Regions:
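Short, amphipathic C-terminal "tail helix"
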Residues: 99, 129-134, 138-141, 277, ...
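Charge-dense, extended regions
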Residues: 175-298
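Charged, long alpha-helical assembly modules
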Residues: 124-126, 130-196, 209
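Charge-rich, solvent-exposed alpha-helical interaction surfaces
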Residues: 64-70, 74, 97, 116, ...
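Glycine-rich hexapeptide-repeat left-handed beta-helix
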Residues: 1-76
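Short, flexible coil/linker elements and helix-boundary hinge sites characteristic
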Residues: 51, 66, 76, 110, ...
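Intrinsic-disorder/low-complexity loop/linker signature
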Residues: 11-12, 86, 166
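An accessory alpha-helical subdomain
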Residues: 60, 65-125, 131-135
Length: 298
């Protein structure tokens, strides 16, 4: 199950599914790798996709949700402990995981929908339906992480088949395939998201109403802002007294805090914290803008 902790306690292994989705450390990791990529060549040999949420990770979350819901059905929703592959999952952890995975899935699918509909002043729902149609036939089914290149399994299987049949015989042709997969990522991602939006929310995107789109956007807003608020709370822990050990050793708690802020800065002015707060404002405005465009079509 993605974004999980494994904890050993009293000779028992506890699985805490999805908990890292609300962790500051996860977001910092996702942000640091693109910053460390100092390649300057226009033609890059390694195709690396840095997206934290992608068909690859969201597919894993959807599978995890299915497993967790199945455990609830088998054992009961009020159980204090669930057992999965030689690990224990606390009932509270399972319920939290379903909530976190749900928010992350809403966030990704909503991002895809909003991106698809951005920048167009629609005059009719027919125009909306037309813009929602996928432009790539590739992208359906399971996706893989191939050393940083995120691509559909079906496309990779097709490459392997062509190599085995002798239709592809050079490294240059394979490199061209990888480059094409990387450059066409967002088209293929939308093909996948299109299917998942229909399956997950039970909507028909070829005839979806403006009101249904507004409902999906509001669900996306709630999830994005909800996850950001959880990150905000997690960041606040790093400014608690327990994190101030070694600061103002001989002083009072007040002096310890002043020493800590002198080195690390105040919580509200911390760059990560200000970025989270700005992200909430930007995403709320982005959702409101699409809602306004859709409400004209009611």
């Amino acid at each position: 199950m993605p974004f999980s902790y494994l904890i050993e306690k009293d000779d028992e292994t506890y699985l805490v599914p999805g908990v890292n989705l609300r962790s500051v450390g996860t977001i910092r990791d996702a942000q640091k790798w693109p910053k460390r990529d100092k390649r300057t060549d226009q033609q890059r040999l390694d195709m690396i996709n840095y997206n934290l949420l992608s068909p690859y990770t969201i597919y894993k979350m959807m599978k995890a949700v299915g497993i967790l819901k199945n455990l609830q059905e088998l054992v009961g929703e009020t159980s204090e402990v669930y057992y999965y592959q030689n690990t224990r999952i606390k009932g509270s952890s399972l319920r939290t995981a379903l909530n976190l995975y749900g928010m992350a899935i809403n966030k990704f699918l909503g991002n895809s929908l909003i991106k698809r509909l951005e920048g167009t002043d629609f005059r009719s729902m027919e125009e909306v339906w037309s813009q929602l149609k996928p432009t790539s036939s590739a992208g359906r089914g399971e996706w893989l992480d191939l050393s940083g290149l995120i691509l559909p399994r079906e496309e990779l299987d097709g490459l392997i088949e062509k190599v085995e049949e002798g239709k592809i015989t050079s490294l240059e042709a394979i490199e061209e395939f990888f480059a094409a997969m990387h450059s066409n990522y967002y088209d293929m991602e939308w093909t996948w998201a299109y299917d998942m939006l229909e399956e997950y929310y039970g909507v028909n995107l070829s005839s979806i109403s403006a009101a249904q789109i507004v409902d999906l956007v509001r669900r996306w807003q709630d999830s994005v802002i909800g996850l950001d608020n959880l990150l905000y709370k997690d960041a606040k822990k790093e400014f608690s007294l327990t994190f101030m050990t070694g600061f103002g050793v001989d002083g009072s708690d007040k002096e310890k805090q002043e020493d800590f802020e002198g080195v690390r800065g105040a919580f509200e002015s911390n760059p990560f914290v200000t970025a989270v707060k700005e992200h909430i404002v930007v995403k709320r405005a982005l959702g409101d803008e699409l809602i306004e465009r859709m409400e004209r079509l009611f």
